């Protein structure tokens, strides 16, 4: 049996069940475990209650139960500079960003990893549903989590080989119900705590209200592709490509009484385009351009590959051809895709392995730009 007692693992603990079980499993495997709670956002609500305080109490309770030391570290400045400013800039540009991808890259596996190293960590661990496997050459491959419904490799796709070399995902081989069961069996304080939803820093708040505190909304016209005026929109940033509802035009007829969807945006003219039908022709595209292209291991500067891709979380994989040039790439779809959204991540897979990904800049239909920003 391996003696793990000399290997120090610093666990990012959020006060949720996943990170609690992560710490428990590592402790049971004999590692030298330290828990760290990251405070990334000042989330005091209108009643003066800070949810982070409640979460930290849960971290403390679990750490005491499993007998590990724990600390709290404040990354509010790093989060603001590296994640939130990016988030706002993307919305200003008419795009729909994915802050979780950036949060993992810049905070959970950079700021936190650096901090863990000052505590003498050999590895960091989180409660993400993903797996890491080291090959005979010492290269770490990131594989999907065993629980298909919970697999989080989409959000981890910007991690580097250096980051993965120092990372453990103890829940990767488990199904979510098994994780709850382990927590309940061990009597952990967080065993019955519900999973958090929403963007990491907004939590359960009203998204529209939250965004309007930072970006003034500019109302404008809402139109069909053929120029019919459908009324007023509340601000382009509140709408995402492919969105159904929320436009206030549900009762308006046309087409075959099909529901209305957001099918395009024109940032320069401040126009929101809407159309009827889930598969409206303006929502379909055949290729995309992406930037911030990144792979989890060394790849040539310029190459072409066939693989599968996801264009949003929990979506089935689609076959694609990827042409990479530096940190940019063209991704050509084997079948037309719906609602490819600038600002979202495109993530590449080879079977179970997550190869990396990039951020979608523009979608095209047969070589012609889709009016999505």
Swiss-Prot record:
- What does it catalyze? S-sulfanyl-L-cysteinyl-[protein] + uridine(34) in tRNA + AH2 + ATP = 2-thiouridine(34) in tRNA + L-cysteinyl-[protein] + A + AMP + diphosphate + H(+)
Q: Name one GO biological process term.
A: tRNA wobble position uridine thiolation
* Record's keyword terms, sorted: ATP-binding, Cytoplasm, Disulfide bond, Nucleotide-binding, RNA-binding, Transferase, tRNA processing, tRNA-binding
Name where it mostly resides. Answer: cytoplasm
Q: Which residues bind ATP?
A: 12-19, 38, 127
GO: which molecular function terms? ATP binding; tRNA binding; tRNA-uridine 2-sulfurtransferase activity
**Catalytic residues (UniProt):** 103, 200
Q: Where is this region: Interaction with tRNA?
A: 150-152, 312-313
Q: Where is this region: Interaction with target base in tRNA?
A: 98-100
Cysteine pairings via disulfide bonds: 103-200
EC id: 2.8.1.13
Which residue numbers mark the site Interaction with tRNA?
Answer: 128, 344
A Pfam family this chain is assigned to: tRNA_Me_trans_M
Give the CC-aspect GO terms.
Answer: cytoplasm
**Where found, per UniProt?**
Cytoplasm
Keyword check for Transport, yes or no: no
Keyword Membrane present in the record's keywords: the answer is: no
Q: What does this protein do?
A: Catalyzes the 2-thiolation of uridine at the wobble position (U34) of tRNA, leading to the formation of s(2)U34.
What family, per the record? Belongs to the MnmA/TRMU family.
Known HAMAP family for this protein? tRNA_thiouridyl_MnmA
Protein name (record): tRNA-specific 2-thiouridylase MnmA
Species name: Streptococcus thermophilus (strain ATCC BAA-250 / LMG 18311)
UniProt lists the gene as mnmA
